[in-house]
Amino acid sequence: SYFGNFKPNNKQKREIYLLFPEPILLNRSVRANFLFTLKTYGIKEDIEERIKESLMFLNLDESLLSKHPNELSSGQSQKIAFAIALSVRAKYYLLDEPSAFLDKNTTLLFKKAILKMHENFNTGFLIASHDKHFLDSLAQKKLYLHSGEILEFENTNVFELENQGVKFCNFIDFSNCKKYKDF
């Protein structure tokens, strides 16, 4: 399991959104993908507002809502998958290589969206990435891992996460996080 020995209940699972590097979209309209995800997370209010806002964060036109995944470019698919994730307004996001395969403009849009989500909804992000430049402009705290071991811990203080890292470590029971009381 993604959570190790910790067994989160359904409410706790809905507080986390995991976004993979390859977009995962159902073979239905973009709007239907949004609606399916929001329903899965138990979200029943402000649906249209959430969809419009997440599209706006990534400079996506609402005309894409009627398209199917096979009608989208790979870049559009990646943006749509991220927009769907943002529409959930999860408490925590696990982003696996979010800048992989992105051009510079889209990478900048993703950075701005992450910062906006944190600013507007106090959302925490745990980002796994080999893209140091992407992380340098976003991360308050960085852990460098090799073969599952923490090699280095760095506090960059780009923006204040109000101890979201500590809450997240406790939430998923990372035993290594205990080494870093200030994380």
Regions found by a protein language model. Give the residues of each.
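Conserved catalytic motifs of ABC-family nucleotide-binding domains
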Residues: 22-32
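Conserved ABC ATPase "signature" region
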Residues: 46-63
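Walker B catalytic motif
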Residues: 68, 97-98
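Conserved ABC ATPase signature
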Residues: 68-72, 76
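Hydrophobic anchor residue at the start of the ABC signature
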Residues: 82-84
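Conserved signature/switch motifs of ABC ATPase nucleotide-binding domains
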Residues: 88-90
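H-loop/switch region of ABC-family ATPase nucleotide-binding domains
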Residues: 128-130
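Conserved beta-strand-loop-alpha-helix hinge in the C-terminal portion
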Residues: 149-172
